[in-house]
Regions:
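Helix-breaking motifs and short loop linkers at transmembrane-helix boundaries and internal kinks
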Residues: 63, 95, 116-121, 150, ...
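Conserved MFS/SLC helix-loop-helix module at the cytosolic interface between two early adjacent transmembrane helices
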Residues: 82-121
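Cytoplasmic helix-loop-helix junction between adjacent transmembrane helices
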Residues: 126-163
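Helix-loop-helix hairpin linking two adjacent transmembrane segments in secondary transporters
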Residues: 160-209
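C-terminal transmembrane helical hairpin of 12-TM major facilitator-type secondary transporters
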Residues: 296-345
Length: 418
């Protein structure tokens, strides 16, 4: 029997004949996997965005208060957020390549339950099950994105996240077309998206299983980037990132959960028009995500984080005082600017804790979801006791916390990717 040794692909061979996967040098970005993960993220977040999109419908149908609306968001975002760091930690230690596909089945179940839920408690249960699916998806998918990134981590995370942002943007539009005219039962059609996502993620799992050993070697090499930092300095940097995630997540919760109500209350627009305006805002968020990741790779993530959150502050402060056309235009600018932060934050954090991509991604996705849920519940309570317009006078101050990004250490002050 003859054994034929096939040569390695040229992009894996270094200048001295070594595998560049082993040496940690240039690696190819696997765009096919990134696009598959991004597409799955698109479908996942499209289904999740149905939840806030139907708030006006279920508020009127069941007579819910703003506090109950906030509690629904809180239930979804807390179930997804609390589990994510643990799922990520487990994925780092014992990777399960097909967990992504299986986790999507939780989302499928939650969507079907939500389409038939006829009480506050059943709706809470439905969104919680969707949250469980999210807790499995985000940390593991973020880990796959880093595996496929090559040396372009910021771009890879942006491609992954833009799928989610695109899904969040298209979800309200589809809800306006399918759910609002035909009622709550029409939500069941979104189960088809869960089936497609599960099938796509199964194929990703095949690649994931094959590439695990290479990713482990890459993580060991990347660890040298932050070897100069003490544990105290790393922990302070992570704490600053948490503050930045808090400011972004709380502000975004006011927009995603209550921007439609704000437009209806202040300008008297219809529910359909308000959903289209939310779609415009979320589309801007999707575009800003890609731009932010690319710029972070080129010029350094610290500066993108700083400019993204603090740079949105002048526009958020103006928002409550403008007329309808300028309100929509300003909301689009806010979406473009503030959304460029998260991919930079996530990659910055994983560079501080290399080899723990799943745990770090789970922690920061979990924080983003959990703080968003707390913010939504808080602003719902505040709206019940004051007014929907008042919460937008309060939330506009949050991006000012972006000033703390100036205290982050410079990991890569300036970096260009050609």
């Amino acid at each position: 029997m003859r054994i034929i040794l096939l040569p390695q692909p040229h992009w894996l061979i270094g200048k001295e004949g070594r595998s560049e996967v082993e040496s940690g040098e240039q690696r190819r970005t696997v765009f096919a996997i990134l696009l598959a993960i991004s597409f799955s993220h698109f479908l996942n977040d499209m289904m999740q965005s149905v939840i806030p999109s139907i708030y006006p419908l279920i508020k009127e149908k069941y007579g819910f208060t703003f506090g109950q609306i906030g509690a629904i968001t809180f239930a979804f975002q807390m179930t997804s957020s609390v589990l994510q760091p643990f799922v990520g930690w487990y994925a780092d230690r014992r990777p399960q390549p097909y967990s992504l596909s299986v986790g999507m089945l939780f989302t499928l179940l939650g969507i079907v339950l939500l389409s038939f839920a006829n009480s506050f408690l059943l709706i809470l249960l439905s969104v919680s099950v969707i949250g469980w699916g999210s807790s499995v998806f985000h940390p593991s998918a973020s880990r796959v994105a880093q595996m496929a990134a090559g040396n372009r981590n910021g771009l890879a995370q942006s491609i992954f996240q833009v799928g989610g942002n695109g899904g969040s943007a298209i979800g309200p539009l589809l809800a306006a077309i399918l759910v609002l005219p035909f009622g709550q039962h029409a939500i069941a059609w979104f189960a088809l998206a869960a089936m497609l996502a599960s099938a796509t993620l199964f194929r990703v799992g095949v690649w994931y299983k094959r590439e695990l050993h290479r990713f482990t070697k890459k993580a060991q090499v990347v660890n040298s980037r932050v070897a100069q930092f003490s544990h105290r300095k790393i922990n302070i940097a992570l704490a600053l990132l948490v503050v930045l995630v808090f400011s972004k997540a709380f502000y975004m919760s006011s927009m995603t959960s209550y921007f439609t109500f704000f437009l209806i209350d202040k300008f008297g627009v219809t529910v359909r028009v308000s959903q289209l305006c939310l779609f415009a805002f979320l589309t801007a968020v999707a575009i800003g995500t890609v731009v932010g990741g690319h710029l972070g790779d080129r010029y350094g993530r610290k500066y993108i984080i700083w400019g993204s959150i603090l740079g949105a502050a002048p526009f958020t402060l103006l928002l409550p005082y403008l007329n309808f056309p300028l309100t929509i235009l300003t909301a689009i600018v806010i979406g473009l600017v503030i959304s460029s932060a998260f991919s930079a934050i996530l990659v910055y954090a994983t560079e501080l804790k290399p080899g723990r991509v799943g745990m770090v991604a789970g922690l920061f996705f979990g924080l983003s979801f959990g703080l968003g849920g707390i913010g939504s519940a808080f602003f719902g309570w505040l709206a019940d006791h004051t007014s929907i317009e008042f919460i937008f006078h309060v939330s506009t101050l949050l991006p000012l916390l972006g000033v703390v990004a100036g205290f982050l250490p410079n990991i890569e002050p300036k970096r260009k990717v050609r």
